[in-house]
């Protein structure tokens, strides 16, 4: 394996070479018929920070180009990988070295800045705080093209209930894009559990893990997975556009919110822009936008969150039941903890989610939140103008993304698999070993496959040069 180190800066370049059945390169040994596939794996460290492995695998090649980075710049790194592959094909070693040397010396630039690495190589630094748009965002575009609206809604509901989810596909690029694209629709929340965009063959036992997960499986491995003891697993087959689930999660969500989301998705199915992401953002705001009404503010005391006030804010029984379950979910708990940290530090926050709350009918009379704003403006804490008038440093935004995106480290999976084996052999775990459960659903029902919807206008745009 050849490494091109870029310490503390943008990325680490590697060439992964396939050597028989070596576990370190198993992910690159899957059979593919497509020429020049781009895909992504994720490494989660002991601090639960994610490092992305952006890869380019050519058909029949014995090596895979890989860029490792904490920066979620999918389009940028895929573009650079394609340029490097082109240099390799044309044997342009000087240009190859020039690009990597420039990248090596490059400090992390601010969002929106144009970066020139060589005469023909440049990119614009993405702003991860903006909503992803079609066709610019490759992950969302591939996900929206491959999966119909009905199955997108079912998968969204399954993620809200923190289920065990497997996504299956024969094409690595589409597989990992669907994993990243679907998870992005949870914004401003992030998937907090096991997150593996493409699972190597020697780690298939992870599919039997007793905790929530979001895992991508190459189709060639699915026969082995089917022979495993899969309990309460949601399976989306991207190739056939079919979804299997033992739960009734979508029907248990408030119907008015889901109906509005479905209608918005159908309206934007033949258009470009951030319409898809904004449709999900509006749904998230409808579900969770009243959290500001549940903030408890007392003089000289830290701001806290009252779950009872949050749930009782709604008259609808369906919404109350959903929110009662939601308050026990890790993705919601981490979201609230993050907001409280910012409020209590006096830093505040301003993002597209808060903007959506302010514009929508779900804002209500969040007097406590505005009381905090008034107090801050009078001088008891830092003022919000640093958030409203200045872009946050790129590294702060990115590292927060990496940390929030997966709080549960992969390290815990093996321990919990061992606990599951002990329990199955007749030894009940102690109370301290009890695992977090996924949210309950009132009914259990298998879902019928739905036909794929036609999105030719989107596919026409997808695939254009960056």
Where are these regions (language model features)?
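Acidic, Ser/Thr/Pro/Gly-enriched alpha-helical scaffold modules and adjacent low-complexity linkers
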Residues: 2-418, 422-456, 460-463
């Amino acid at each position: 394996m050849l490494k091109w180190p870029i310490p503390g800066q943008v990325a680490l370049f590697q060439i992964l070479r396939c050597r028989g059945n070596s576990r370190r390169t198993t992910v690159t040994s899957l059979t593919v018929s497509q020429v020049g596939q781009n895909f992504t794996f994720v490494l989660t460290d002991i601090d639960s920070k994610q490092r992305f492995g952006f890869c380019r695998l050519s058909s029949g090649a014995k090596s895979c180009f890989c860029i490792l980075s904490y920066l979620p710049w999918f389009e940028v790194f895929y573009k650079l990988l394609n340029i490097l592959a082109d240099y390799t094909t044309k044997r342009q070693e000087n240009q190859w070295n020039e690009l990597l040397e420039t990248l090596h010396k490059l400090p992390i630039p601010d969002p929106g800045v144009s970066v020139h690495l060589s005469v023909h190589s440049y990119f614009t630094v993405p702003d991860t705080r903006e909503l992803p748009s079609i066709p610019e965002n490759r992950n969302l575009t591939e996900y929206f093209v491959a999966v119909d609206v009905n199955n997108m809604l079912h998968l969204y509901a399954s993620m809200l209930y923190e289920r065990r989810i497997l996504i299956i596909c024969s094409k690595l690029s589409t597989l990992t894009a669907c994993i990243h694209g679907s998870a992005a629709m949870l914004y401003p929340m992030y998937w907090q559990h096991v997150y593996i965009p493409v699972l190597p063959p020697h780690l298939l036992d992870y599919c039997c893990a007793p905790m929530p997960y979001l895992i991508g499986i190459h189709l060639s491995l699915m026969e082995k997975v089917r022979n495993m003891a899969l309990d309460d697993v949601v399976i989306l087959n991207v190739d056939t556009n079919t979804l299997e689930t033992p739960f009734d999660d979508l029907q248990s969500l408030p119907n008015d919110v889901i109906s509005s989301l479905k209608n918005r998705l159908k309206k934007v199915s033949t258009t470009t822009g951030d319409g898809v992401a904004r449709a999900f953002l509006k749904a998230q705001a409808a579900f969770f936008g009243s959290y500001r009404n549940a903030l408890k503010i007392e003089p000289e005391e830290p701001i806290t969150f009252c779950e009872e006030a949050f749930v009782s804010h709604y008259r609808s029984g369906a919404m109350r039941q959903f929110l009662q379950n939601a308050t026990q979910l890790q993705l919601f708990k981490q979201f609230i903890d993050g907001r409280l940290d910012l409020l209590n530090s006096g830093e505040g926050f301003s993002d597209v989610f808060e903007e959506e709350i302010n514009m929508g009918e779900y804002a209500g009379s969040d007097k406590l939140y505005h009381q905090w704003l008034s107090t801050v403006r009078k001088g008891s804490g830092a003022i919000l103008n640093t958030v409203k008038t200045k872009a946050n440093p790129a590294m702060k935004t990115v590292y927060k993304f990496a940390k929030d995106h997966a709080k549960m480290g992969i390290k815990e999976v093996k321990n919990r698999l061992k606990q599951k084996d002990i329990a199955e052999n007749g030894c009940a775990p102690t109370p301290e070993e009890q695992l977090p459960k996924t949210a309950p659903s009132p009914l259990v029902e298998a879902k019928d496959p739905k036909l794929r919807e036609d999105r030719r206008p989107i596919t026409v745009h997808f695939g254009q040069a960056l």
